[in-house]
């Protein structure tokens, strides 16, 4: 009789994964943020959720309204967060002036976005710890792993968005008492720079996750989710070094970092 494999118990059923296997497959959960949850945060959402080894990811905007360019600088297209889908925006702009919005890239951007998730969400309306199982049911890319409504890393794409996120987290009162690393990667708000920024954010995510996996292997993952334990403490201490090494490779994307609490 053949001996059971590493993934099979003696009775032929699937064996529970070992701690080492769990560490190898561990993924940090990410949140990407820009002003309108349209261009920069969604390009990063795409990169993270469709990477060869994808990450759990959610995304938001920090503006009061979703603003997209219109026929002139004084005539933007304005929408509400949380209630207007990317598909609705696409259909409206298509019917208004297909040629204009095709040429300026908005229709292509909205096509990408509606294949990632339902619609733009506002960061200030997010309640950390509130379940997001409906986003899994909707088929949002990156939703698996974010059902619990918590993330480990928030990456904003503009300094004013970083300020808004940090202020909002303080105002929410850290009810979960759970640490979260908040980065800003400064990306100009155009399609070309968003592509570059998305690639850079994915590299930062990979570096952070590699360090997290190493620490969980070396020091046990006990207490990790609560921000306690040797593995978590060691990882948190290494984050500034990881960012500094990343910044050397991406000097044109100035970055900020702070440790905050959900």
From Swiss-Prot:
GO biological process: intracellular phosphate ion homeostasis; mRNA 3'-end processing; positive regulation of telomere maintenance via semi-conservative replication; regulation of pericentric heterochromatin formation; regulation of siRNA-independent facultative heterochromatin formation; sno(s)RNA transcription; termination of RNA polymerase II transcription, exosome-dependent; termination of RNA polymerase II transcription, poly(A)-coupled
Gene Ontology MF terms in the entry: protein tyrosine phosphatase activity; RNA polymerase II CTD heptapeptide repeat S5 phosphatase activity
Ranges where the record places region Disordered: 1-21
Predominant cellular place of this UniProt entry's protein: nucleus
The keyword Nucleus appears for this protein: yes
UniProt GO cellular component terms: chromatin; mRNA cleavage and polyadenylation specificity factor complex
InterPro entries for this protein: RNA_pol_II_suA
Pfam family, one: Ssu72
Family: Belongs to the SSU72 phosphatase family.
PANTHER family per the UniProt record, alphabetical: RNA POLYMERASE II SUBUNIT A C-TERMINAL DOMAIN PHOSPHATASE
Known partners and oligomeric status: Component of the cleavage and polyadenylation factor (CPF) complex.
Protein name: RNA polymerase II subunit A C-terminal domain phosphatase ssu72
UniProt source species: Aspergillus oryzae (strain ATCC 42149 / RIB 40)
Lineage: Eukaryota, Fungi, Dikarya, Ascomycota, Pezizomycotina
């Amino acid at each position: 009789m053949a001996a059971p494999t590493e993934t099979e118990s003696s009775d032929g059923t699937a064996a529970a994964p070992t701690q080492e296997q769990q560490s190898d497959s561990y993924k940090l959960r990410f949140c990407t943020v820009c002003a309108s949850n349209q261009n920069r945060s969604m390009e990063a959402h795409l990169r993270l959720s469709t990477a060869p080894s994808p990450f759990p990811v959610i995304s938001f905007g920090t503006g009061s309204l979703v603003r997209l360019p219109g026929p002139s600088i004084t005539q933007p297209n304005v929408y509400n967060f949380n209630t207007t889908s990317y598909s609705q925006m696409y259909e409206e702009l298509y019917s208004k002036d297909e040629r204009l919005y095709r040429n300026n890239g908005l229709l292509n951007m909205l096509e990408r976005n509606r294949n990632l998730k339902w619609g733009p969400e506002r960061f200030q309306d997010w309640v950390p710890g509130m379940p997001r199982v409906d986003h899994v049911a909707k088929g949002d890319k990156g939703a698996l792993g974010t059902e619990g409504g918590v993330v480990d890393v928030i990456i904003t794409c503009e300094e004013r968005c970083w300020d808004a996120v940090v202020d909002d987290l303080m105002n929410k009162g850290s009810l979960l008492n759970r640490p979260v690393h908040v980065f800003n990667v400064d990306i100009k708000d155009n399609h070309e720079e968003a592509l570059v920024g998305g690639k850079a954010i994915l590299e930062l995510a990979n570096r952070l996750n590699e360090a997290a996996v190493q620490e969980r292997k070396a020091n046990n993952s006990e207490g990790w989710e609560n921000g306690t334990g040797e593995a978590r403490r060691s990882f948190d201490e290494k984050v500034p070094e990881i960012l500094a090494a990343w910044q050397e490779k991406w000097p044109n994307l100035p970055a900020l970092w702070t440790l905050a609490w959900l």
